[in-house]
């Protein structure tokens, strides 16, 4: 099941989220918008299982990466009304 993975421009290019992902959903790509000259990208969101390890690994104050779980996952986890 794929989930929406959103990477914000607050990404500092540290690679923590890429290393934390157990399914290699994320990768770093060149980007001139930060000091590291790279930013996380999510080319394989269809492989995302929604574990949110990437969110946990993100060191920025405002999480630079967010995983938005689909309605079916939210319901099966008992998070829906």
Curated annotation (Swiss-Prot):
Topology class, membrane: Peripheral membrane protein
Cofactor(s) this protein cannot do without: [4Fe-4S] cluster
Chain ranges of the 4Fe-4S ferredoxin-type domain: 1-31, 39-68
Cited PROSITE patterns: 4FE4S_FER_1, 4FE4S_FER_2
BP GO terms, sorted: photosynthetic electron transport in photosystem I
UniProt cofactor note: Binds 2 [4Fe-4S] clusters. Cluster 2 is most probably the spectroscopically characterized electron acceptor FA and cluster 1 is most probably FB.
SUPFAM superfamilies membership: 4Fe-4S ferredoxins
GO MF, any single term: oxidoreductase activity
Superkingdom as given in the UniProt entry: Bacteria
Cross-referenced InterPro entries: 4Fe4S_Fe-S-bd (IPR017896), 4Fe4S_Fe_S_CS (IPR017900), PSI_iron-sulfur_center (IPR050157), PSI_PsaC (IPR017491)
Keywords, in A-Z order: 4Fe-4S, Electron transport, Iron, Iron-sulfur, Membrane, Metal-binding, Oxidoreductase, Photosynthesis, Photosystem I, Repeat, Thylakoid, Transport
UniProt xrefs under Pfam families: Fer4_7
Binding site for [4Fe-4S] cluster 1: 11, 14, 17, 58
Subunit structure, interactors included: The cyanobacterial PSI reaction center is composed of one copy each of PsaA,B,C,D,E,F,I,J,K,L,M and X, and forms trimeric complexes.
Function noted in UniProt: Apoprotein for the two 4Fe-4S centers FA and FB of photosystem I (PSI); essential for photochemical activity. FB is the terminal electron acceptor of PSI, donating electrons to ferredoxin. The C-terminus interacts with PsaA/B/D and helps assemble the protein into the PSI complex. Required for binding of PsaD and PsaE to PSI. PSI is a plastocyanin/cytochrome c6-ferredoxin oxidoreductase, converting photonic excitation into a charge separation, which transfers an electron from the donor P700 chlorophyll pair to the spectroscopically characterized acceptors A0, A1, FX, FA and FB in turn.
UniProt name for this protein: Photosystem I iron-sulfur center
The organism of origin for this protein: Crocosphaera subtropica (strain ATCC 51142 / BH68) (Cyanothece sp. (strain ATCC 51142))
Classification of source organism: Bacteria, Bacillati, Cyanobacteriota, Cyanophyceae, Oscillatoriophycideae
């Amino acid at each position: 099941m794929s989930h929406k993975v959103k990477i914000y421009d607050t990404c500092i290019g540290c690679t923590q989220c890429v290393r934390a992902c157990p399914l290699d959903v994320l990768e770093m790509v060149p980007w001139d918008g930060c000091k590291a000259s790279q930013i996380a990208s999510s080319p394989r969101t269809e492989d995302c299982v929604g574990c949110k390890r990437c969110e946990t690994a993100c060191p920025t104050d405002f999480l630079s990466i967010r995983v938005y779980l689909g309605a079916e996952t939210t319901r099966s986890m008992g998070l829906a009304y």
